[in-house]
Regions:
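A conditional alpha-helix N-cap/helix-loop micro-motif detector
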Residues: 32, 39, 64-65, 105, ...
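Short, internal active-site loops enriched in acidic
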Residues: 7-8, 63-67
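Short hydrophobic/charged patches on amphipathic alpha-helices used for structural packing
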Residues: 68, 72, 199-202
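Non-transmembrane accessory domains of multi-pass membrane transporters/channels
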Residues: 1-44, 50-58, 143-149, 159-162
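Soluble catalytic regions of membrane-associated enzymes that act on cell-envelope
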Residues: 35-65, 74-78, 82-90
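Intrinsically disordered or low-complexity boundary/linker segments at protein termini
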Residues: 1-14, 81-251
Length: 251
């Protein structure tokens, strides 16, 4: 699942990047032999999938009693193009000296907002509700505030994926111009659905993926009952850095 999500976002570019998979065990009294076993088990399935896709992934395993500080330090040291955090099925509101890495972590949901406050790179929170590779992919676009998502959307369409676009009904002509351009370039791959509220995002297929900005998620998540009915989510907080050279990955 982890690699398939990144493959959707970055396509062929994925193989050109340095990927780091990080797993943290909270505590300080773990037996070294047990730690080695946990490390091996944590990355087994991911490494199998990476080998199948011919993608190099470095494994980073640490035992710590300062989880948030450890992650923030690691991100600031590695300067990843994206930090991906796992949040289980619900979400409320990578080797040293190697820049340009993609990094993902499994994390307790109550720590995510704290980390978002402290790191500048794009942060993607994956809420897994039985996502199945190859299932329907949808983007939620709330207007020009979500313009940074178009870089991921465009790359996905370039790679031949079909995408459903949930568009907030707005009179913003600039935003509608971007949508019209997508429809002209990818008429057979885009399906438009205008929406007014979060209840319009509930679909019959439950194994798909719904991608939205963190800002849109914050605005839509007030109705927790409806949010629980949505398919798997990928919530992306935009890059806080400015003037970075790697616009394709970091917007």
């Amino acid at each position: 699942v982890l690699l398939s999500i990144y493959d959707l976002l970055f396509g062929k570019q994925l193989k050109k990047n340095h990927l780091i998979a990080a797993h943290y065990t909270v505590g300080t009294d773990l037996n070294p032999l047990n730690a080695e076993h946990y490390a091996s088990e944590s990355f087994a399935l991911l490494n199998q999938q990476a080998a199948k896709l011919n993608i190099q992934v470095d494994n980073h395993y640490r035992v710590t009693d300062k989880l948030v500080q450890e992650i923030i330090h690691f991100v600031r040291k590695e300067h990843p193009d994206m930090l991906r955090l796992g949040a289980g099925s619900h979400y409320r509101s990578d080797m040293p000296g190697t820049p340009g890495a993609l990094l993902w972590l499994t994390l307790f949901r109550d720590k995510i907002d704290e980390i978002m406050e402290q790191v500048k790179c794009p942060v993607a929170v994956f809420v897994n509700r039985q996502y199945r590779e190859g299932s329907a992919v949808s983007f939620v676009l709330g207007g020009m505030i979500d313009l940074f998502l178009f870089s991921y959307l465009d790359k996905m369409l370039q790679n031949g994926h079909s995408v459903r676009l949930f568009l907030f009904d707005t009179d913003d002509e600039e935003f509608r111009g971007h949508i019209d351009d997508l429809q002209v370039r990818y008429p057979e791959q885009t399906m438009i659905v205008w929406f007014a509220g979060v209840e319009d995002l509930v679909t019959e297929e439950k194994d798909g993926l719904l991608i939205m900005s963190h800002l849109s998620y914050t605005k839509l998540s007030e109705d927790e009952a409806v949010m629980r009915e949505l398919s798997s989510l990928l919530v992306i907080r935009r890059n806080k850095n400015t003037g970075d050279k790697n616009e394709g990955l970091e917007n």
